[in-house]
Every structure is written in C-alpha cells, then in structure tokens.
C-alpha cells in the first residue's frame, strides 16, 4: 500500500488525506456512493473519510449520519428528473456545523473548509447548515432545478 502525504492548509495547518479525493471520485464518476461524510481526524492533522453511504441509501440515511453535536463536511449526490423527463445528478458540498458543537471545532472546520472544498473538483452547490431545518431535501431540489 502506498502512502501519500497530505498537503497542509496554510491557514489552519489541516491536510487532506488522499482517500478523500479518491472516495469523492468514486461518488462522482462511478456512482458508488450516495454520500460521503468527512471529518478532521482526532489529531487535527488532516481531513479523512468517516463514512460512505451506498448508492441505494436515502437522504434520511444521509441526515442520520450527520452528528447532532459535532462538525463535519459532507458530499451528497442528489438525483432528480427534469421537467423534460431527463435523469440528472447534482453534487452538493455540505459544511455541517451544529450550533451546539464546540467553538474550537467550528473554528477549525471553518478555516479548513475552502482548502478542502477546492480538492473536490466537480461540486455543483455548497450548503452551510447548523441544524436539520437548514438542510432539507426540498432545498436541494430547489437548488438543483
């Protein structure tokens, strides 16, 4: 197994594990996943993949995977049918920062977000949410159309 060093973010010092981009590409190109949840590792060194959801999982499964009291980054592959009856897909980047999460975690995720987001080439929309009401399936539907 080859180890690829992650590059650190100049503003926060947080790197991005190679598995993050690889897993994103699996979602984007192969449709292997419905969603991917990312977290900053316990040593605050890099962003890593925490969980993936299979292509058969629902939006509710995705929402259940987001912690109630801790920050995360997430990617969700939203499938929909247009008015012209064409099957489409849009990829959403979610910056999840619950209001009850620790201040330090909020700051760490906020300062690392742009660097991490740039690693994921092909994201269509970005959503910042602090509670489930700000991340609703109808919001995704509105943005995608």
UniProtKB/Swiss-Prot annotation:
Official protein name in the record: Actin-depolymerizing factor 11
Pfam families according to UniProt: Cofilin_ADF
Residues annotated as domain ADF-H: 11-145
One cellular-component annotation, GO: cytoplasm
Keyword terms: Actin-binding
Entries under Gene3D superfamilies matching the protein: Severin
SMART domains in alphabetical order: ADF (SM00102)
């Amino acid at each position: 197994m080859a180890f690829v060093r992650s590059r650190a973010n100049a503003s926060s010092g947080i790197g991005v594990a190679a598995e993050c981009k690889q897993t994103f590409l699996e979602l984007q190109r192969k449709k292997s996943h419905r969603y991917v949840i990312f977290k900053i590792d316990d040593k605050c060194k890099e962003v890593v993949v925490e969980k993936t959801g299979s292509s058969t999982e629902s939006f509710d499964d995705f929402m259940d995977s987001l912690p109630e009291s801790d920050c995360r980054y997430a990617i969700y592959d939203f499938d929909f049918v247009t008015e012209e009856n064409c099957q489409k897909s849009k990829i959403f980047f979610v910056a999840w920062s619950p209001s009850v999460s620790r201040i330090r975690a909020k700051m760490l995720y906020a300062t690392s977000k742009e660097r991490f987001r740039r690693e994921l080439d092909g994201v269509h929309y970005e959503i910042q949410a602090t509670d489930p009401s700000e991340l609703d399936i109808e919001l995704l539907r509105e943005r995608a159309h």
